[in-house]
Amino acid sequence: MKKKVVIELQNVRRNFMVGDEEVHALRGVSFKIYEGEFVTIMGKSGSGKSTLLNQLGCLDTPSSGEYILDGVPVRTMSKSQRAVLRNRKIGFIFQNYNLLSKTTSVENVELPLMYNSEVSAAERHQRAIDALKAVGLGDRLYHKSNQMSGGQMQRVAIARALVNNPAVILADEATGNLDTRTSFEILVLFQKLHAAGRTIIFVTHNPDIANYSSRNIMLRDGKVISDEINNNIQSAAEGLAAIPVNTDE
């Protein structure tokens, strides 16, 4: 059975004017991402990965080339059209969680559904609860953001990304603010989502993350320099189990 293409970039270029100088941030990027893949996009500072993230997230459009998200051409869309598409098709997860402070987990997770007139308040609430249970926070439904650890807040952010049942989960340095143990706990969750058939793109500067994904794309100077399938995916659960437990009181 032919795999569904969720994301397709065709010779995408993005140029910016900085003063009198034109900067070529993306220089003809092309690739396809298929349903159910867990892809890391890596690159050092200045590689173009942040610009690419903005393209993938429909926050910006190419100077030339085509970006097709779940069958929808993005480049010629208006800003408002892209906002609607983004809310329906993409679940964002950020390094700094982007949660509303002093707001409960359920209320934070409900947010992406607030603008969907097809979803009733009761359904919105239930879907938020289901998403939080799916990330292991069934006992933290009504805790506020300022009452939770960094790992718990990132789980809320992941639940918020899942609640719309998006075509793709787009994570930007999603373990960047977490300690080693908590980072592995979040990677375990990403691997579980991948095993359940979710399409995940994880943008990072940390090459170790690539060990836990199914495919790795490397950027340098605005170009794809490698795009490889990972035939030896490491288990984040095993990595977590190998971390010594701190027994200090």
Report the location of each language-model feature.
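Short, Lys/Arg-enriched, disordered terminal segments
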Residues: 1-4, 247-249
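ABC family nucleotide-binding domain
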Residues: 4-219
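Conserved beta-strand-loop-alpha-helix hinge in the C-terminal portion
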Residues: 223-249
